[in-house]
């Protein structure tokens, strides 16, 4: 049934295959159908109330296991209190859904009385309060977990191998589990070494801000125009970059007008810069909407690339792009094309 459902949806909407919600929904459904009966067989409660909450626990655990590799890959975090949330929210959600059906039915035939709307409103308010309360325990949310697409696939391989071994233990399945564990370890070591032996200079796509990351191995230096340490720790673009490159932010520096990286001289012009004609550069970075005559700069300088980050006005970026096209110099608008990287 799940396969037919997936086939029919993708037949009409093939791009849903790349939708995060679609992937998470069907991963959760698949593992609920497959795993929940196995978990449920471990204990049979004697009364209906215990059975109700036991079903919530088994369904929650199966769904969480099924979506774990995908969640870590896309969101780089894992909620440690998902059991608590589900035990408190799901019973209330059932009541809210029932009230919602009643309200919609009455609304279809007549005007809604206030006594009919209030219980639904209170139910939603209580549910949101519970979710907010659980989310406030930030120490139980495991964040900044690095992952890659290959690691996610290998993690699913390990998960499926463990479940098959748990269902029926045998020598072949034991070897399969051990092989999957070794494969995951090899991928982790490879990723760590790959990023540890590389370096790059990246202009991030940060709206109204200039944020540059200079990564040498697994250490990142954040270069910005006034970002405080607290802001850097809370900036999701920076944290996602650090997590995605298996690295850590170790240094913070203010933005300067000249930078050097991998034999490239980078000239950075902002709204307070004064351009000198003999100030040659391989790459020109424009930030904070500087009032410069780009055509004159390009004639005197002839850089290999002109980059405009996301802190510039869109109208200026469009003018700069036209100027670069006329001068036949490559132009990269970070707000449109995404981050710019020098390796």
Each model region followed by its residue ranges:
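Hydrophobic alpha-helical transmembrane segments in multi-pass membrane proteins
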Residues: 1-83, 144-194, 342
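Hydrophobic alpha-helical segments embedded in the membrane of multi-pass proteins
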Residues: 3, 91-99
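Divalent metal-coordination and catalytic microenvironments
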Residues: 21, 67, 88, 123, ...
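Membrane interface segments of multi-pass transport proteins and intramembrane proteases
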Residues: 34-57, 83-87, 95, 102-122, ...
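Hydrophobic alpha-helical transmembrane segments in multi-pass integral membrane proteins
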Residues: 66-74, 101, 128-139
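Conserved hydrophobic/aromatic beta-strand scaffold that supports enzyme active sites
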Residues: 87, 101, 211-213, 258
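Alpha-helical transmembrane signal-anchor/signal-peptide segments
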Residues: 191-212, 306
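Extracytosolic and intramembrane catalytic regions of membrane-associated proteins
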Residues: 213-343
């Amino acid at each position: 049934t799940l396969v037919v459902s997936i086939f029919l949806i993708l037949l009409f909407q093939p791009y849903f295959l790349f939708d995060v919600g679609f992937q998470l929904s069907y991963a959760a459904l698949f593992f609920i159908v497959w795993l929940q009966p196995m978990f449920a067989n471990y204990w049979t409660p004697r009364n209906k109330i215990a059975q109700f909450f036991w079903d919530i626990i088994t369904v929650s655990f199966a769904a969480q296991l099924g979506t774990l590799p995908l969640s870590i890959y896309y969101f780089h975090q894992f909620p440690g209190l998902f059991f608590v949330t589900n035990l408190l929210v799901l019973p209330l959600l059932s009541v809210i859904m029932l009230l919602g059906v009643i309200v919609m039915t009455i609304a279809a035939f007549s005007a809604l009385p206030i006594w009919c709307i209030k219980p639904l409103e209170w139910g939603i308010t209580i549910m949101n309060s519970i979710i907010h309360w659980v989310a406030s325990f930030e120490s139980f949310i495991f964040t900044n977990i690095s992952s890659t697409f290959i690691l996610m696939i290998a993690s699913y391989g390990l998960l499926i191998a463990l479940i098959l071994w748990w269902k029926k233990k045998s020598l072949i399945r034991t070897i399969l589990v051990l092989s999957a564990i070794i494969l995951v370890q090899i991928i982790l070591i490879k990723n760590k070494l790959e990023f540890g032996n590389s370096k790059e200079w990246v202009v991030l796509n940060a709206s109204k801000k200039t944020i540059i990351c200079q990564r040498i191995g697994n250490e990142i230096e954040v270069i910005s125009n006034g970002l405080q340490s607290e802001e850097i720790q809370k900036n999701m673009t920076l944290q996602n970059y650090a997590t995605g490159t298996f690295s850590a932010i170790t240094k913070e520096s203010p933005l300067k007008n000249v930078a050097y990286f991998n034999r490239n001289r980078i000239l950075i012009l902002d709204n307070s810069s004064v351009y000198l004609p003999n100030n040659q550069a391989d790459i020109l970075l424009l930030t904070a909407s500087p009032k410069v005559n780009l055509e004159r700069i390009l004639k005197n300088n002839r850089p290999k690339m002109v980059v405009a980050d996301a802190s510039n006005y869109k109208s200026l970026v469009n003018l700069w792009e036209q100027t670069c096209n006329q001068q036949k110099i490559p132009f990269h608008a970070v707000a449109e094309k995404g981050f710019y990287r020098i390796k």
